[in-house]
C-alpha cells in the first residue's frame, strides 16, 4: 500500500521520533533552568529569562526556526572564516534539536514556574526542618510534587513539539514529512501520502496520550479528585 516506500517512510518516522525526544529533553532542561531563574532573587537573570519567554511566545515558530537556523549558520561561518577554516553546514538534525529545544524551552519555563508556585510552601519548610540540602529537597520533595501540577502542561508541550517537527523538514531534515512528500511526488499520489503522514503523527500522539495518562496516575497517587 506504500508503493515500495515503506522503508523510506519508516526511517523518516524514526528520525521524527528521535528529533522530538531529543528536543523535548533540551526544552525540559532549559525550562527547569528558566523557571529557577525567573523565581530567583537575581533580578538581572530573571529579566533575561522574562525577555526570552516573551520573545519566544510572541513570534511564530517557523520565523524563529529560520532565524535561529540561519543565525547559527552565519555565526559558525564567521568563526570558521576568522580561523581560516573551511565552511561547513550545520547538520539538519542538530539544527532541529537546537531550534525546537530553544523555542519550546520558553513554554516549559512557564510550565515549571507555575508548577513550582503551586507546591505548598510547607513541603519545602518540612524538608529544611529535616536537614535536607537544597539538592535533596529538589530531587526528593519539590520535583515529585511539581510533576503533579506540571504534567498537563508537559503533555501539551510534548504534543506541540511532536507536531512542530514537521517544520524541520524545511531545514533539509529527511523526516517523515520529507519521506512522504518524496513518495507522493514519485507516485503522483500526494494526497494519499499526506494522509499516511498524518496517520503516523496520529499514532505518535495517541501512544503519547497513553504514556502521559500512566504518568498522571503515577504522580497523583493519594490525591482525591472532587466530583463537580
Name each region found by the language model.
Residues 1-228:
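Transmembrane alpha-helices and adjacent helix-loop boundaries
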Amino acid at each position: 500500500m506504500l508503493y515500495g516506500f515503506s522503508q523510506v517512510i519508516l526511517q523518516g518516522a524514526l528520525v521524527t521520533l528521535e528529533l522530538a525526544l531529543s528536543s523535548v529533553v533540551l526544552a525540559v532542561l532549559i525550562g527547569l533552568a528558566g523557571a529557577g531563574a525567573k523565581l530567583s532573587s537575581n533580578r538581572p537573570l530573571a529579566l533575561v529569562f522574562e525577555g526570552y519567554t516573551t520573545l519566544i511566545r510572541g513570534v511564530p515558530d517557523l520565523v524563529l526556526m529560520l532565524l535561529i537556523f540561519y543565525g547559527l549558520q552565519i555565526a559558525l561561518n564567521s568563526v570558521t572564516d576568522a580561523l581560516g577554516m573551511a565552511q561547513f553546514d550545520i547538520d539538519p538534525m542538530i539544527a532541529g534539536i537546537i531550534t525546537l529545544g530553544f523555542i519550546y524551552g520558553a513554554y516549559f519555563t512557564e510550565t515549571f514556574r507555575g508548577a513550582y508556585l503551586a507546591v505548598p510552601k510547607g513541603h519545602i519548610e518540612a524538608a529544611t526542618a529535616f536537614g535536607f540540602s537544597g539538592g535533596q529537597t529538589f530531587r526528593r520533595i519539590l520535583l515529585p510534587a511539581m510533576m503533579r501540577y506540571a504534567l498537563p502542561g508537559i503533555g501539551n508541550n510534548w504534543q506541540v513539539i511532536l507536531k512542530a517537527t514537521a517544520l524541520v523538514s524545511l531545514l533539509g531534515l529527511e523526516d517523515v514529512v520529507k519521506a512522504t512528500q518524496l513518495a507522493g511526488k514519485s507516485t503522483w499520489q500526494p494526497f494519499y501520502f499526506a494522509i499516511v503522514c498524518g496517520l503516523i503523527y496520529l499514532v505518535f500522539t495517541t501512544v503519547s496520550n497513553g504514556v502521559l495518562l500512566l504518568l498522571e496516575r503515577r504522580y497523583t497517587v493519594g490525591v482525591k479528585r472532587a466530583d463537580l
